[in-house]
């Protein structure tokens, strides 16, 4: 990992959230399932002068909610899996894709084109009294070096693998689907999990560009699981998967306020 940081005007998370709306780690083999660490909810601040006319966003309905909270809410009929997916996709569009001054967190490489179909199927199973497991209907994101045997790409952030579609799910993904998880999308990362060079920038890849720290957008998100750390800290999914070699989960978790 490298301490190089994207340059430019300092733009912090409060400015982003004021303009556009604004993990615990559970080891799963060589990966981790991250959830928000229970930090205080972000406070919106005045937007930059160039965006002074922008309306303040509504509070995000799922702000800092845990997998347990969301599961209990679905069991009580407060949400469906489809509704959770809709809310997180809206959050991604608002905070990750656009962002203040055209710069969002850039944590998500790709969303799953089949995600609504998957969520609807899991909702039908719930209505029929069939629950696959503790993650039934929960939207989760995966680092873009983890194979999914679907229509999403698995590229390790490299343009060389830009059209690479895996033939089958990684074992980890098989287990997640068996437990009922909804694979919402893939997260950006340090290209080749930070094996691109000895002087690479944390969170940058040819495919995804630069991931930004959700607390201070021009600061280092660390890596190589940068998009997962930034995305879960920014409440872009209920939980996320990263991979660890030498700090690739621990460092983004530290920089982005996850445990």
Predicted regions and their residues:
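N-terminal secretory signal peptides
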Residues: 1-11
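Generic anion/oxyanion-binding catalytic loop in active/binding sites
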Residues: 5-6, 59, 73, 220
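Short, flexible, glycine/charge-rich loop motifs used to bind or transfer phosphoryl groups or to couple energy/partner
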Residues: 6, 129-131, 171
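Aromatic-acidic/polar surface patches that form glycan- and anion
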Residues: 9, 63, 221
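Residue-level signal for the nucleotide or nucleotide-sugar donor/cofactor binding architecture
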Residues: 11, 65, 226
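Short, well-ordered alpha-helical
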Residues: 15, 19-162, 192-194
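Short glycine/serine-rich loop/turn segments
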Residues: 135-259
């Amino acid at each position: 990992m490298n301490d190089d940081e994207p340059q430019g005007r300092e733009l912090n998370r409060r400015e982003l959230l004021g303009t556009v709306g604004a993990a615990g780690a559970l080891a799963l083999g060589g990966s981790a399932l991250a959830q928000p660490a229970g930090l205080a909810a972000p406070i919106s601040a005045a937007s930059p002068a160039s965006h002074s006319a922008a309306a303040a966003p509504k509070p995000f309905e799922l702000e800092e909610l845990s997998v347990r909270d969301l599961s209990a809410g679905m069991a009580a009929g407060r949400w469906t899996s489809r509704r959770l997916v809709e809310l997180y996709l809206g959050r991604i569009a608002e905070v990750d894709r656009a962002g203040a001054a055209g710069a969002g967190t850039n944590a998500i490489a790709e969303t799953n084109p089949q995600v609504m179909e998957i969520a609807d199927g899991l909702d039908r199973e719930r209505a029929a009294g069939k629950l696959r497991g503790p993650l039934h209907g929960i939207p989760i994101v995966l680092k873009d070096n983890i194979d999914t045997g679907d229509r999403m790409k698995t590229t390790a952030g490299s343009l060389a693998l830009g059209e690479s579609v895996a033939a089958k799910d990684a074992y980890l993904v098989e287990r997640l689907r068996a437990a009922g998880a909804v694979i919402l999308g893939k997260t950006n990362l340090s290209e080749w999990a930070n094996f691109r060079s000895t002087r690479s920038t944390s969170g940058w890849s040819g495919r995804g560009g630069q991931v930004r720290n959700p607390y201070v957008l021009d600061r280092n998100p660390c890596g190589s699981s940068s998009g997962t750390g930034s995305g879960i800290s920014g409440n872009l999914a209920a939980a996320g998967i990263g991979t660890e070699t030498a700090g690739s989960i621990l460092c983004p978790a530290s920089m982005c306020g996850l445990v």
